[in-house]
Amino acid sequence: MAEAVAYLNNRRVSVAWNGERLVTGRADGPLEFDGEGSLLVWDLRGILKNRPAPGPLPLNPKRETLVDSGMAWGEDVIDAIMADRGTVIVPLRSLRGWGELDEALVYAELELVSLDWVGEPVAAHADFQGDIVELLRQLLRRNIPRVMVNSLDGSFPFIPAGLAGSVRLDVAMLTDGHPPNWAGEVFRLG
């Protein structure tokens, strides 16, 4: 299991799904990224505002760091990249449809897109709601090699084996449980 942290105002915080939206809990302590292996970082200030709020992170250059800063517009990917805080995750949760994802692809060759899951995709735009298989196919058509499925309630989508072998599927979990067999790297937030 890989390490994952959520932070708000330079403090580690707990995060949970209340059935409608992400909510933050107590501030646990200062933000430190010591250790080894991959690290998933949820910048809750950016996620809650739907716009990257770039600021310095005390990153460890020896670790692969994946950063979800939140964004609603394709051009927001520029701010996230320029912050140079690790691999940029483009979240579909608040992006304004395929057009905005395509705009982000104009600015950068994206390595990683995330999809929030609560028995079905959770997204503000109808383009990203519905059949998970079709969503993954659309991402493959756009040459996106890696997708992070954020399981907000402990449930996971059914991914056919043929499709699971075509794209790297990682998982971020907010609750305890066992990841699906198609999961690549598994991160636990909490």
Describe these PLM feature segments:
Residues 5-7, 42, 66-70, 91, ...:
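A cross-family glycoside hydrolase active-site/sugar-binding cleft signature
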Residues 1-63, 72-82, 109-113, 119-148, ...:
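Conserved N-terminal beta1-alpha1 strand-loop-helix module at the mouth
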Residues 76-101, 148-154, 167-190:
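Glycine-rich phosphate-binding active-site loops on the catalytic face of alpha/beta enzymes
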Residues 53, 101-102:
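Short amphipathic alpha-helical segments
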Residues 105-107:
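Short, conserved loop/helix-junction motifs that constitute active-site signature segments
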